[in-house]
Amino acid sequence: MSLLAQLDQRIRHHGGLIVSCQPVPGSPLDNPAIVAAMALAAEQAGAVALRIEGQANLQAVRPLVTVPVIGLIKRDLPDSPVRITPWLEDIDALAQGGADIIAIDGTQRQRPASVSALLAEIHRLGKVAMADCSSLDDALECWQLGAEIVGTTLSGYTAEETPDEPDLALVQCLSVAGCRVIAEGRYNTPAQAAEAMRCGAWAVTVGSAITRLEHICGWYNTALKAAVYPANEQ
């Protein structure tokens, strides 16, 4: 049975939650052993797959879990805004680290390696390709180029301002177009994740709301301060 067929079964049985275990950089939780523990806990809690950044984290996670792992490498490049798996050698590193699915930036921006070249390398290594996209045009082009999965990962993150709500409209458009779409980006409540599935998502990736303690505490702190000190009293 293919990896995607196995994931189809997991999604039907467990509900389609993918957990992204990516601590805030520099956080006390930003340690491969801790990332691996979070990943194992997520699997035991019913996650159908995991999203793991960096070769060291991937190598720590892979021996502990049985669910598929989406691997990526983030880089800050001086000559390109593309951060997610920008180089061909990143794909080789992720494959060697045990990633089942390799995520790349699928946007139409200046980049060191073309989307088509990255997809070809993923497939040469026998892995499944996921394109993290920001728009309908991005995603449809990546789908046509052969990405087995498209994600709404970068919707709202390539402009100056990031909206608070997830892009459910993009999920629905991609589903209608026949794409296998993972809803990702600002799915901070179970209700939002459920709505994404109703809009046609194949699965939903949740990160900050589960694995970024600093973000969760920040949401609570903001709400509590607003309750104790209303705007007109500050």
From Swiss-Prot:
InterPro entries: Aldolase_TIM, NanE, RibuloseP-bd_barrel. Keywords: Carbohydrate metabolism, Isomerase. Pathway: Amino-sugar metabolism; N-acetylneuraminate degradation; D-fructose 6-phosphate from N-acetylneuraminate: step 3/5. It catalyses: an N-acyl-D-glucosamine 6-phosphate = an N-acyl-D-mannosamine 6-phosphate. GO terms for molecular function: N-acylglucosamine-6-phosphate 2-epimerase activity. Its EC number is 5.1.3.9. The keyword Isomerase applies. GO terms for biological process: carbohydrate metabolic process; N-acetylmannosamine catabolic process; N-acetylneuraminate catabolic process. Belongs to the NanE family. This is Putative N-acetylmannosamine-6-phosphate 2-epimerase. It comes from Klebsiella aerogenes (Enterobacter aerogenes).
